């Protein structure tokens, strides 16, 4: 415990301690005068000098002091920004693969340039990871001036980037992008048909901004690339009508565990309704094996109705269900719940039910970022998750002192009996702040609550802005102006992370709006000066009013999210205030608070509208939050342990796939040998081979199924052992494939290698998709093994390994089957030959072609009967 306390709260707790960091900062400062005397060309040429030193044997640690000093001087010249000493400390922490906990407004964006520049000197690339496209684009353009001045290339990847743009960006020295784009590029690269079409170049060093959001909050959400699967979507609507007819006695809901299930009475009622609708066979039970799929429909419909709320967990936008991120409050467009839950929500909202998807490729952020050779991160809130950062990612969290002491006042919570009383008190508090022109940022946990508060403020005549997933387009502008005198901003958890709230307003953001219609440079300059002067006057007004006031309307499950909201106020020594208003009807206290506390509050005889402030209440709330945090950590640990098993298999499959892409030819001997061994073992039960019809006929039948040719029984008559049979079949397969290869020599060009590689890749992808689906099914029910006193994780490892061996064998068999049955038309058109040659260089020339469309080679056949055979 002592070591943990030192690690979390000792602000310079690394290496030799405080002196280690102070000494480095002192050495950097000592170089400042000399560097300031250099010309721009002399300063900016330091990069090539540093690379020469690295090539001569020096390390990045050796270059830390001069490199940081050069970056600071460059930032001063090109951006008029100079790194503070505490920012240098943050940069050192990042270089040493730590998490730098820096308060809001302390300049994390600028800090990242120090470690990114130093790391980029190796030439292997540095990835600076942000939470959204806006920040990635902004930071790459803003901080890119520093890197470019120093002769380094800077790239940016957003959701709209093309493959060509992505490949160019990954080749840059420093890349800014989001965690989602990086993760999906990794998955997409491992679905490509050629190395040339892959965009990523390796995993060297990642600096993760808002590291708690990416590595903690999103750790439970896997990255999934999916494709449609054939399943009756109409059933979701029919089952939805059935669930609507249920009464509270028919089901039980456990909000704490996010589960809903039928009671005994409910199961009987559902069974009768399903029978009357003809959805299950007469005489069968709801829980019979044959009805397990129908039970799945019912279960997901029940979850959709009883556990997921519109405007809290999701919104309906343009006829689609769009998921709301529970931690940021942002829309997660393009994301869909898996396992039929999204379809159940669409049926619940009476929307068009889209087809269900199956997983084509998946990974988790935990395993993705652990592939990097080096990783570090920045956030304003890391201390509460220090154990998890260390245990999962081997990252130490380090608190960086603020440049100026924090002046924000954090008031005690006010607790009310009902939610109605709480919101009335919140409105009264906002009105009082508004009277003295104190800007107020009101944090809510859902769209529904933010719009309720908006209605109440409108009735009181208070002008305000609302920032939630419905109105996210002007997020940066709204947050940037939330510090103007008398401004009232209602925001969900999204609250503009990455955008500072400047007291008095942000003149740059105001200028974008005010100057849009002015074309004269002189007028624009004069207007901008007016805006700067106005924001300075407004700042004085806000400071006199007490700075930005933060109002929390509910405690989040995680203390860290609450701290993030508080952290919007009091930036860089500004005054500020924060206060939370709670009620006994809030989800946290209702679901996780102890009954003892609730009983105690009721015994106090609180009157309507009366608030209570007591250390016991504060401690009870903190205990409830710790309880939820511990539960969520356990969930993430469990998910990681299971995904580690899948990740090992993912690495095996991706490595085998890359080996195929990296080699022009492939030796199929191992493949058909394993197929033949399995074939003979299934048919010949004894050590010795019996050429009787009972053994010979099944053997020949299997040979025909796999190789597509009739084998004469006489060929096997003189064989005596299983090994001899396998040996003969190996020779037979080798001869067959050599003949096939000869058939694929056309007009002097050998097309066999391309065709064989395409068969290998498509077959492996197909089997991996099926394997992922099987692993998902196994994982869903594996916890039931604990009833039999078995360790679910160990059982999962054993069965997953067995399934992998079976999958690889089926893959070998599929490849041999396809290669044996392939044909090449002798009168192939020039277009066909061109497409073969093009495909040998990378991406498929047939990508995007439906299997039932006519083949583009001009044969007139359907694609699936022509060149589509290479896509199977």
Swiss-Prot record:
Which residues are recorded as binding ATP? 87, 105-109, 500
Q: Name one GO cellular component term.
A: cytosol
- Classification via Pfam families: P-loop_SecA, SEC-C, SecA_DEAD, SecA_PP_bind, SecA_SW
Q: Where in the cell is it found?
A: Cell inner membrane; Cytoplasm
The record's keywords, sorted A to Z, are: ATP-binding, Cell inner membrane, Cell membrane, Cytoplasm, Membrane, Metal-binding, Nucleotide-binding, Protein transport, Translocase, Translocation, Transport, Zinc
Asked whether the keyword Oxidoreductase is assigned, the reply is: no
Q: Which sites bind Zn(2+)?
A: 855, 857, 866-867
Among InterPro entries, the record links this protein to: Helicase_ATP-bd, Helicase_C-like, P-loop_NTPase, SEC_C_motif, SecA, SecA_CS, SecA_DEAD, SecA_motor_DEAD
GO BP terms: namely:
intracellular protein transmembrane transport; protein import; protein targeting; protein transport by the Sec complex
Task: Name its co-factor(s).
Answer: Zn(2+)
How does this protein lie in the membrane? Peripheral membrane protein
GO molecular function annotations of the record: ATP binding; metal ion binding; protein-exporting ATPase activity
Per the UniProt record, which residue ranges are transmembrane?
none
Reply yes or no: does the keyword Cell membrane apply: yes
What are the EC numbers? 7.4.2.8
Q: Can you quote the record's cofactor note? A: May bind 1 zinc ion per subunit.
Q: Which reaction does it catalyse?
A: ATP + H2O + cellular proteinSide 1 = ADP + phosphate + cellular proteinSide 2
Lineage: superkingdom: Bacteria
**HAMAP family tied to this protein:** SecA
Described purpose of this protein according to its UniProt entry: Part of the Sec protein translocase complex. Interacts with the SecYEG preprotein conducting channel. Has a central role in coupling the hydrolysis of ATP to the transfer of proteins into and across the cell membrane, serving both as a receptor for the preprotein-SecB complex and as an ATP-driven molecular motor driving the stepwise translocation of polypeptide chains across the membrane.
- What NCBIfam families does the database record attribute to this sequence? PRK12904.1, secA
User: Can you state the subunit structure given in the record?
Assistant: Monomer and homodimer. Part of the essential Sec protein translocation apparatus which comprises SecA, SecYEG and auxiliary proteins SecDF-YajC and YidC.
Q: Which family does it belong to?
A: Belongs to the SecA family.
For this entry, the protein name equals Protein translocase subunit SecA
Species source reads Anaplasma marginale (strain St. Maries)
Gene behind this chain?
secA
């Amino acid at each position: 415990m002592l070591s943990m306390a030192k690690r979390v709260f000792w602000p310079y707790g690394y290496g030799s301690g405080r002196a280690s960091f102070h000494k480095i900062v002192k050495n950097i400062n000592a170089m400042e005068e000399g560097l300031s005397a250099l010309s721009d060309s002399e300063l900016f040429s330091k990069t090539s000098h540093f690379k020469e030193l690295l090539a001569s044997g020096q390390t990045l640690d050796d270059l830390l002091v001069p490199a940081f000093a050069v970056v600071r001087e460059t930032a001063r010249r090109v951006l008029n920004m100079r790194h503070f000493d505490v920012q240098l400390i943050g940069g050192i922490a990042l270089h040493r693969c730590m998490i730098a906990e820096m308060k809001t407004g302390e300049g994390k964006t600028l800090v990242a340039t120090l470690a990114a520049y130093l790391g980029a000197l190796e030439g292997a690339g540095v990835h600076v990871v942000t939470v959204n496209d806006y920040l990635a684009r902004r930071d790459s353009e803003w901080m890119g001036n520093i890197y470019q001045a120093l002769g380094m290339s800077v790239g940016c990847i957003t959701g709209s980037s093309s493959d060509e743009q992505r490949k160019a960006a990954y080749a840059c020295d420093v890349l800014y992008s989001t965690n989602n784009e990086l993760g999906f590029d990794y998955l997409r690269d491992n679905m490509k048909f050629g190395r040339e079409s892959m965009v990523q170049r390796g995993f060297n060093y990642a600096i993760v901004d808002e590291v708690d959001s990416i590595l903690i909050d999103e750790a439970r959400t896997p990255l999934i690339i999916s494709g449609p699967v054939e399943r009756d979507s109409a059933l979701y609507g029919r089952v939805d009508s059935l669930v609507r007819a249920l009464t509270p006695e028919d089901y039980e809901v456990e909000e704490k565990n996010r589960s809903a299930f039928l009671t005994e009475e409910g199961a009987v009622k559902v069974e009768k309704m399903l029978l009357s609708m003809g959805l299950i066979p007469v005489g069968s039970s709801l829980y019979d094996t044959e009805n397990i799929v129908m039970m799945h429909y019912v279960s997901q419909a029940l979850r959709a109705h009883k556990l997921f709320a519109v405007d809290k967990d999701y919104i309906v936008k343009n006829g689609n269900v769009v998921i709301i991120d529970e931690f940021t409050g942002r829309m997660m467009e393009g994301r869909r719940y898996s396992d039929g839950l999204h379809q159940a929500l669409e049926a619940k909202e009476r929307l068009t039910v889209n087809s269900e998807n199956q997983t084509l490729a998946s990974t988790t952020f935990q395993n993705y970022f652990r592939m990097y050779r080096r990783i570090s991160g920045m956030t304003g809130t890391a201390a509460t998750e220090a154990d998890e950062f260390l245990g999962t990612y081997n990252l130490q969290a380090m608190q960086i002192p603020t440049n100026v002491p924090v002046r924000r006042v954090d008031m005690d919570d006010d607790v009310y009996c009902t939610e109605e009383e709480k919101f009335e008190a919140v409105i009264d508090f906002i009105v009082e702040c508004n009277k003295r022109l104190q800007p107020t940022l009101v944090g809510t946990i859902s769209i529904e609550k933010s719009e309720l508060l908006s209605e109440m403020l409108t009735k009181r005549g208070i002008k305000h802005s609302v920032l939630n997933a419905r109105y996210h387009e002007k997020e940066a502008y709204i947050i940037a102006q939330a510090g103007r005198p008398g401004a009232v901003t209602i925001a969900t958890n999204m609250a503009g992370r990455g955008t500072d709230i400047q007291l008095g307003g942000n003149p740059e953001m105001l200028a974008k709006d005010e100057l849009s219609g002015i074309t004269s440079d002189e007028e624009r300059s004069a207007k901008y000066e007016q805006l700067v002067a106005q924001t300075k006057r407004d700042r004085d007004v806000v400071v006199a009013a007490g700075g930005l006031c933060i109002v929390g309307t509910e405690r989040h499950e995680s203390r860290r999210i609450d701290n993030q909201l508080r952290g919007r106020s009091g930036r860089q020594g500004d005054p500020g205030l924060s206060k939370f208003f709670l009620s006994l009807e809030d989800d946290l206290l209702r679901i996780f608070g102890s009954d003892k506390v609730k009983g105690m509050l009721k015994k106090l005889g609180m009157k309507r509208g009366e608030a209570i402030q007591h250390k016991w209440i504060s401690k009870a709330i903190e205990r409830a939050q710790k309880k939820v945090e511990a539960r969520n950590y356990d969930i993430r640990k469990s998910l990681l342990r299971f995904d580690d098993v899948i990740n090992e298999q993912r690495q095996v499959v991706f490595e085998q796939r890359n080996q195929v892409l990296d080699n022009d030819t492939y030796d199929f001997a191992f493949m058909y040998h394993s197929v033949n061994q399995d074939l003979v073992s299934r048919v010949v039960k004894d050590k010795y081979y019996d050429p009787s019809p009972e053994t010979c006929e099944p053997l020949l039948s299997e040979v025909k199924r796999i190789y597509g040719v009739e084998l004469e029984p006489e060929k096997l008559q003189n064989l005596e052992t299983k090994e001899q049979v396998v040996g003969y079949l190996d020779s037979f397969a080798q001869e067959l494939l050599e003949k096939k290869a000869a058939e694929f020599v056309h007009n002097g060009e050998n097309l066999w290698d391309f065709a064989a590689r395409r068969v290998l890749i498509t077959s492996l992808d197909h089997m991996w998709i099926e394997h992922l689906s099987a692993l998902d099914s196994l994982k869903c029910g594996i916890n039931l093994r604990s009833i039999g006193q078995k360790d679910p994780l160990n059982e999962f490892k054993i069965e997953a390994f067995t399934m992998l061996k079976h999958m690889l064998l089926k893959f070998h068999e599929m490849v041999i089957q396809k290669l044996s049955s392939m044909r090449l038309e002798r009168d192939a058109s020039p277009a066909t030959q061109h497409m073969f040659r093009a495909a040998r260089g990378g991406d498929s020339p047939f990508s995007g072609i439906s299997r039932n469309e006519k083949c583009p080679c001009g044969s007139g056949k359907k694609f699936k009967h022509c060149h589509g055979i290479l896509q199977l």
